[in-house]
């Protein structure tokens, strides 16, 4: 995010698709390579020590990004314990597209940051090697089902998409926004005009929001999902769908910005942690007193063609271990996949995820991967027809 609570550092978000920026880092036109092997940050030129090199593709904001205590702890500790060099690379654009382009001559050993939408895509292309990690015994089976039932991607963190809203808007609606339904936006021009979304044709957060809305309409309302967009899109002025999450949140958090933005339910906890509790809150989609949301699940996978399968597996085991999982809530601002790891008390500011019914359970990763191209094409047709020029 390029705007944040006063006095707080910029909060990173993962970069997994074209147009999506992190709160701290932007990907350069070429991959940035960072080496971690107990020597800090440096370009890896080869040490001549005969130690193996593990190449990891991920997003620039992982564990706060290079140089942070959490990032260095995760990679340096593993490198020292296993006598291995680690190259962390941040490919431009989409992780799946990078892996697919290199499929005939794989470069990476591991990929961190695939989600419930991109992981099944990677699996469909044969890009991943399944691994049934022992640590999955402490991971809820639901998370595994939602990202990769075949263990091609192993979940390490999760969360929920949310609709963030300002305290001022909550007051104007007498608190009604806290239990908003999608039909509330479809039938209220004021609400629709104050909702800033991300363009799903270029942004992963936008894709996830589109899937959330579709599943809500199909599973909860049993209605045509296009009705929502045809009703709200004519009011997308001046706040047209943003090209990425960072742009959207920056606009939301700037003076005179929209009252609501599609983001993540952990945002209020982040704001409270950095000294502005209640600056904004977050909600999911409600109906008849029940909360429904879209669960985002992030995983790590072994790249098909890796030359270091045993090291790959040991790194995944490390990523699921308590010491690493403890770093997730205050660095990734997500929930740890390891259910034995507690989240800090500041998460009381976020909506209780235990009270949200995940819409993911009504579909499967494979179904989403197969349906997404058609959904995006339909969305684009609606946008062309209804969004004001």
Predicted stretch roles:
Residues 128-138, 153-154, 183-186, 273-294, ...:
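Short beta-strand->loop
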Residues 106-114, 129-168, 183, 193-200:
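A structural signal for short loop-to-beta-strand junctions that line the ligand-binding cleft
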Residues 358-389:
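Conserved C-terminal helix/tail region of periplasmic/extracytoplasmic solute-binding proteins
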Residues 49-121, 250:
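Early extracytoplasmic/lumenal segment of secretory-pathway proteins
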Residues 212-287:
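Ligand-binding pocket segment of bilobal, Venus flytrap-like solute-binding proteins
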Residues 1-49:
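Secretory targeting signatures
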Residues 298, 303-363:
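Mature extracytoplasmic/periplasmic domains
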Residues 116-127, 145-177, 206-216, 295-301:
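Periplasmic solute-binding protein
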């Amino acid at each position: 995010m390029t705007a944040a609570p006063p006095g707080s550092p910029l909060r990173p978000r993962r970069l997994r698709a074209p147009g999506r920026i992190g709160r701290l880092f932007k990907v350069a036109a070429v991959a940035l390579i960072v080496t971690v092997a107990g020597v800090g940050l440096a370009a890896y030129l080869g040490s001549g020590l005969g130690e193996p090199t593990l190449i990891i593709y991920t997003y620039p904001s992982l564990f706060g990004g290079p140089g942070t205590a959490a990032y260095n702890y995760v990679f340096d500790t593993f490198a020292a314990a296993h006598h291995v060099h680690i190259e962390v690379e941040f490919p431009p654009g989409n992780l799946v597209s990078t892996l697919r382009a290199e499929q005939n001559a794989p470069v990476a050993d591991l990929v961190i940051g695939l989600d419930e939408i991109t992981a099944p895509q990677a699996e469909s292309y044969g890009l991943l090697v399944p691994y049934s990690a022992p640590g999955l015994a402490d991971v809820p089976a639901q998370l595994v089902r939602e990202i990769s039932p075949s263990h091609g991607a192993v979940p390490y963190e999760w969360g929920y998409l949310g609709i963030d809203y300002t305290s001022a808007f909550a007051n104007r609606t007498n608190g009604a926004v806290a239990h908003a339904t999608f039909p509330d936006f479809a039938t209220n021009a004021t609400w629709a005009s104050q909702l800033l979304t991300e363009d799903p044709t270029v942004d992963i957060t936008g894709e996830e929001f589109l899937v959330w809305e579709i599943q809500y309409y199909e599973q909860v309302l049993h209605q045509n999902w296009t009705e929502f967009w045809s009703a709200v899109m004519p009011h997308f002025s001046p706040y047209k769908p943003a090209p990425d999450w960072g742009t959207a949140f920056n606009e939301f958090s700037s003076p005179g910005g929209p009252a609501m933005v599609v983001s993540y339910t952990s945002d209020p906890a982040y704001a409270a942690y950095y000294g502005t509790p209640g600056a904004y809150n977050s909600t999911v989609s409600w109906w008849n007193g029940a909360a429904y949301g879209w669960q985002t699940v992030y995983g790590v996978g072994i790249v098909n063609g890796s030359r270091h399968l045993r090291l790959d597996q040991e790194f995944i085991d490390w990523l699921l271990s308590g010491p690493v999982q403890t770093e997730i809530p205050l660095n990734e601002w997500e929930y740890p996949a390891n259910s034995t790891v507690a989240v800090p008390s500041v998460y009381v500011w976020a909506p209780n995820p235990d009270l949200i019914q995940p819409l993911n359970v009504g579909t499967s990763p494979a179904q989403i991967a197969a349906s997404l191209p058609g959904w995006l094409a339909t969305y684009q047709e609606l946008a062309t027809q209804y969004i004001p020029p």
